């Protein structure tokens, strides 16, 4: 590992944050250097601090310690992420023999110099007790590898040298802070302190020294491990492992089943669904097929901090069956075994510790599947990604540890204390989840005005959305509009032709592989052609039928195996048309195709109810879109209708507004609201038609 400290960059940081004290700007700079190195910290892990002398509001001298806020990501930390606290009263806490979690939390909060700052890191007292101006802390993989080895302290001393203090694992808070301060004072010229199963602390009176000591000692650990592993085969594959016929298809099927097996009723009665992440690179696939795979899954986290993201252990799937029923049986069996073990550990720990705790959900977050690789689940896509990053680093670290010596896991007691520590749980937050969080929504015709309106409402309510269209340019434009407003984390896109079942089926498999499955399908792709029957070319009729009828058939058909494997129900909301009940002259192909698709959707409602899948239809009318994204249908029919009525574009919009009973201008977002209603399962409804047209009497469902 090399130092990335650059004087020019450091000066640029000082200039960028010119209103801050220089020491604080430099603290931000090296904090980001640490945060951007995933071999040092992952997703909010690690922490840094700096001590400054300043004036308080009364003009009195005051020493402040700025510590990274709890859960703040070092990679992107801003000034607000460093929490300033009055140092003197914090240091006096060192005289205490013990302090409750609640009292420590309160002491940290009342010492903040800005009441609106986030909560400081749980390591804040440790940073306060250490005398050096700068303190850096990381969960470096290579350091943790050595701490997990039998005779770990011996390995650490040989690897790191004499100027490093080594402590056994101590729970974060006052006990660890006092122990670190004591060993710092006891050892002369100490440059770093390692806490077993926890990580490494480095320090210095200037920012570069503290940072580069971190890099230096982590580099020593890496070199030591590399030397010990030289010439050894990292992975020994299991014998007689059945090869997969189609890796990507197997991965898609498997995540559907995992996702469904792990779904459970939430406190509000809704179904808690999951997103998945698949890591199937060469290294993860090799480990999944190895003799050590099952043992790695059972040997726990690298550091107790990780347990709130990944649980302590992972599930190992020795085989991914080509038969869906057999696959579901094996996954269900493995998940139930995990839950039973989790429940047993929880009961055992609360009994031994004589405490009362509310049990968290017992579902696994990490799976290792033979031949597939790593799969993680999360209640948000970000949570699934975080779990995947941590699990991937954990598996690689355990593989390296194998080459050095015997790997020793952390005790269940220590992991339990961290998982059920109230101050650690705060990192996860307690906010009420959005209405559709956990759902994957697939929208065809995603490049048009209605597709945009539907996607926007689904994203606003927390769903992950996959925009699908045959027109890549229009799809890209809609994606850009939505990502600007909502970001990319819950937004995906796929390009395919709904009339081509094979490519569509492959696209749905890829959507499953990327997100876990499908909960909401919105068949919205459609085309139109204006011609009286006498003038309507048969091939044009066939073309409209192919997209509007066969396309609807294809997407519904392709979704059924996904819904079946998940076993958690779902919704199909077909974007139909006012023309189903109120057709127009010279619009025969469109009206007939929409009416046929509408009838097909009713049949789907009859057939899919046994899977818990509801099928409903939305009948919009006169959705024009806007200047950014127009309606393709109105691009086609609008000119002829303006001409026949002597209207300009705005006049045509007004004509259709005045035509409906409510005199309402119907927008794409109104269609989106209807889709959200059906997707949220607020009523036990299937086979229904919901007009979104302002009230057109001739189009009343009947």
Whereabouts are the PLM-identified features?
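Active-site helix of classical SDR
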Residues: 556, 593, 601
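Alpha-helical segment proximal to the catalytic Tyr-Lys
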Residues: 561, 606-607
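Substrate-binding pocket helix/loop in short-chain dehydrogenase/reductase
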Residues: 532-533, 540-542, 656
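Residue(s) in the substrate-gating loop at a strand-loop-helix junction
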Residues: 577
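C-terminal substrate-recognition "lid" of short-chain dehydrogenase/reductases
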Residues: 664-692, 697
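Glycine-rich flexible loops
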Residues: 1-441, 453
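Short, small/polar-rich loop/turn modules that mediate ligand/substrate recognition or access, typified
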Residues: 522, 609, 614, 685-687
């Amino acid at each position: 590992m090399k130092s990335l400290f650059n004087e020019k960059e450091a000066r640029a940081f000082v200039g960028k944050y010119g209103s801050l004290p220089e020491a604080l700007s430099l603290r931000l700079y090296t904090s980001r250097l640490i945060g951007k190195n995933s071999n040092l910290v992952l997703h909010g892990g690690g922490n840094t601090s700096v001590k400054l002398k300043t004036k308080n509001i009364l003009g009195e001298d005051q020493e402040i310690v700025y510590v990274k806020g709890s859960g703040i990501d070092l990679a992107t930390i801003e000034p607000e992420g460093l929490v300033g606290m009055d140092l003197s009263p914090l240091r006096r806490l060192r005289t205490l023999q013990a302090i409750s979690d609640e009292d420590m939390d309160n002491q940290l909060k009342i010492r903040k110099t800005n009441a609106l700052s986030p909560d400081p890191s749980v390591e804040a007292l440790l940073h306060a007790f250490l005398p050096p101006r700068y303190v850096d802390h990381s969960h470096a993989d290579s350091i943790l590898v050595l701490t997990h080895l039998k005779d770990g302290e011996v390995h650490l001393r040989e690897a790191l040298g004499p100027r490093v203090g080594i402590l056994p694992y101590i729970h974060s808070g006052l006990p660890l802070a006092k122990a670190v301060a004591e060993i710092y004072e006891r050892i002369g010229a100490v440059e770093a302190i390692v806490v077993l199963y926890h990580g490494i602390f480095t320090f210095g009176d200037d920012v570069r020294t503290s940072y580069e000591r971190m890099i230096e000692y982590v580099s020593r650990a890496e070199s030591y491990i590399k030397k010990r592993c030289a010439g050894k085969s990292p992975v020994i594959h299991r014998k007689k492992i059945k090869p997969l016929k189609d890796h990507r298809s197997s991965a898609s099927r498997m995540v559907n089943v995992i996702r469904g097996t792990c779904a459970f009723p939430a406190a509000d009665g809704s179904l808690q669904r999951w997103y998945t992440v698949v890591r199937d690179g060469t290294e993860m696939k090799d480990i999944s097929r190895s003799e050590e795979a099952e043992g790695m899954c059972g040997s726990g986290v690298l550091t107790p901090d990780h347990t709130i993201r990944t649980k302590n252990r992972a599930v190992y799937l020795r085989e991914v069956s080509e038969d869906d029923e057999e696959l579901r049986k094996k996954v269900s069996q493995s998940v139930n075994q995990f839950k039973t073990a989790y429940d047993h550990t929880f009961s055992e720990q609360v009994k031994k510790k004589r405490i009362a705790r509310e049990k968290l959900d017992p579902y696994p977050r990490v799976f290792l599947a033979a031949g597939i690789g790593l799969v993680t689940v999360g209640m948000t896509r970000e949570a699934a990604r975080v779990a995947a990053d941590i699990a991937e680093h954990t598996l690689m670290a355990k593989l390296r540890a194998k080459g050095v010596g015997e790997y020793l896991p952390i005790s269940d007691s220590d992991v339990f204390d961290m998982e059920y520590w109230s101050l650690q749980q705060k990192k996860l937050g307690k906010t009420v989840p959005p209405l559709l969080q956990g759902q994957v929504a697939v929208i065809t015709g995603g490049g048009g005005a209605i597709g945009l309106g539907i996607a926007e409402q689904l994203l606003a309510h927390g769903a992950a959305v996959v925009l699908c269209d045959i027109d890549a340019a229009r799809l890209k434009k809609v994606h850009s509009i939505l990502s600007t407003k909502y970001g990319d984390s819950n937004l995906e896109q796929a390009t395919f032709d709904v009339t081509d079942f094979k490519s569509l089926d492959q696209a749905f498999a890829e959507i499953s592989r990327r997100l876990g499955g499908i909960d909401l399908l919105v068949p919205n792709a459609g085309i139109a052609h204006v011609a009286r029957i006498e003038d309507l070319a048969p091939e044009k009729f066939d073309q409209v039928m192919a997209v509007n009828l066969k396309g609807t058939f294809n997407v519904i058909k392709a979704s059924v195996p996904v819904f079946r494997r998940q076993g958690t129900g779902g919704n199909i909301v077909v974007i139909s048309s006012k023309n189903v009940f109120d057709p127009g002259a010279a619009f025969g192909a469109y009206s007939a195709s929409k009416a046929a698709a509408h009838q097909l959707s009713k049949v789907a409602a009859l057939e899919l109810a046994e899977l818990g899948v509801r099928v409903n239809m939305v009948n919009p009318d006169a959705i024009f879109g806007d200047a950014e994204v127009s309606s393709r249908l109105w691009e086609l029919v609008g000119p002829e209708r303006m001409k026949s009525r002597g209207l300009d574009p705005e006049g045509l919009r007004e004509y259709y507004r005045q035509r409906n009973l409510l005199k309402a201008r119907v927008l794409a977002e109104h269609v989106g609201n209807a889709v959200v209603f059906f997707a949220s399962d607020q009523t036990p409804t299937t086979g229904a038609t919901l007009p979104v047209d302002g009230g057109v009497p001739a189009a009343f469902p009947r």
